[in-house]
Amino acid sequence: MWIRALLCIAMLAIAAGVALAARRDWTGSAACGTCHPQQLAAWQTTRHAMTRDRFPAKPEGRCLACHGTGEAPAGPAIAVEVGCEACHGAGAAYAEDDVMRNRPVARVLGLTDTSTPTARAAVCSQCHARQTRGTVFDSSAPVHPVKSVSR
């Protein structure tokens, strides 16, 4: 009974956008890449992966809210990069293979829904709410396009 109550509280907090992650809840992009190597390789070629190059020194917490992965500006950033978990949510709770394969459970445990263009736009618009450097943000463009391997 208490497990059901805990899951309900977690679902309500996630739906309300409340940050529940602690430093130990973040796995880092390299950990995600152990099961998703094509996505990791594709992401590594993007501006999201190269965020650190934009800052001459350690960025302020307010910058890391969009240019980092973690709890910034309210808490610590785990990386100066827009890593997997910056968009998909802190992964420690849902990273196990059997959990990741069960999407409803993974979502309850923190996996952010990015399965539709509307869901992706909602995630992306948290940082891409305005035009940057004269470039209009295209929410329909793939973030880390994976090229299919022809045989």
Locate the predicted segments by residue:
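Short sequence/structural segments immediately N-terminal
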Residues: 3, 18-151
